[in-house]
Amino acid sequence: AMTTRLVGSEMCIRDRYMGPLIKTQMTRCIHCTRCIRFATEVAGVPELGAIGRGENMQITTYLEKAMESELSANVIDLCPVGALTSKPYVFEARPWELKKTETIDVMDAVGSNIRVDTYGWEVKRVLPRINEEINEEWISDKTRYACDGLKNQRLDTPYVKINNKLKPSSWDEAFKAVSERISKTKSEKIAGFIGDMTNMETTYAAKDFFEKTIKSENLESRYEKLYINTNVRSNYLFNSSIEGIEKSDLIILIGTNPRFEATILNSRIRKNYLKNKTEIISLGDVGDLTYPYQVIANNTDTIKDIIDNKHEISEKIKKSKYPCVIFGQSVLKLKSAPYIFEEFKNYLLENDKISDDWNALNILSKNSSTVGSYDLNVLSKNSSYEILDKLENNEFEILILFGQDNLNFEKKNEFIIYIGSHGDKGASIAD
């Protein structure tokens, strides 16, 4: 007689909907609850839970809806049995067929460590690499899934505009069109703009080209009217470090929403809050963050009160051993930005919050190439205000865009040269 026959009941559970990124096969689930703990503790969105008891227990999203977290796909890496897998990657390739390349993420300024898996010329998936100083073992969903846009609208050959239509051309024809136009134009009428994801090698080559060949100082890496002081490198860095956030005992957000501007950084702030119940204060109501925070104002007058020791926050900063003040880009766009930044910096210096041991002053950049461009001093001679005003007034005759797609101006008679990898907004207006 057979002694291996199954006598008990089999577990057969219908697959749950968890959104467009996570594919579920719940019959594989062993109820380890890693995904529940991740959603509740790390992501800060308690949308996963267990219902039922004993052998009837099931993992589910409470209302059959997508996980509303920018870290949601990390549950795929956490699941030990393949009950949660990547929906866009399913049936795309076998792991042993893929070439694995270790690299750095460019979707934000954090620089998460990632591994890119390619099959032939196609990027199939992006996975996190462990780096305890930066991203630990997490990456944002944007980092993980932005690769699906890489194969669309690739610029694989030069294009020249003929009769208002971009037509493929040879490199010789493209260079001839560019050199003829540049040689007939005065250097002060030529401007260049560096893009958000332009690597430092290209940026340096562009700077060299503008200084030595064109002899123009109109090269700018900012596409918005931003105040930045590049006299000292610490004026534009995240000085407390991402890992340092964990020991901070007071966090002040000034005009920034780290949940969307730097997702991985936000997870560190949440980690600190859960561990130490650190006080988090925000100047500006930034909406739903994954931890409790106190909004003290929606205007910049409060900053002046803090500097003048007229606000309760002043005393908290003085008493704090490791304060962390994070300036967002939205503050640096203000006309009062030079005053706000410099005075707040002086205030921190006076109270010994900027020293060799700990620097409380932090700038949270949005783009991966920002700090590299500042390091290379790719900033127009006077300020971004002047060059962007000239751009809006159509004072330039030639614009060279190095992967820059965010400029806000109306094209009139400018001759636009676009250098980039994809047919984005910049390529569509190029000549």
Predicted segment positions?
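Single conserved hydrophobic/aromatic residue that forms the stacking wall/gate
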Residues: A1-G8, C12-I13
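Short, surface-exposed charged micro-motifs
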Residues: T3, E47-G49, N113-R115
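Short, conserved phosphate-binding/catalytic loop or strand-edge motifs used
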Residues: E10, R14, P46-I59, L226-I228
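Hydrophobic alpha-helical bundles that form the membrane domains of multi-pass transporters
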Residues: M18, C29, E41, P46-G49
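Extended, Lys/Arg-rich, non-catalytic nucleic-acid recognition/anchoring regions
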Residues: L21
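Catalytic alpha/large subunits of respiratory electron-transfer oxidoreductases
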Residues: Q25-M26, C32, I36-R37, A43, ...
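Short hydrophobic beta-strand motif reused across regulatory alpha/beta modules
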Residues: L48, L84-T85
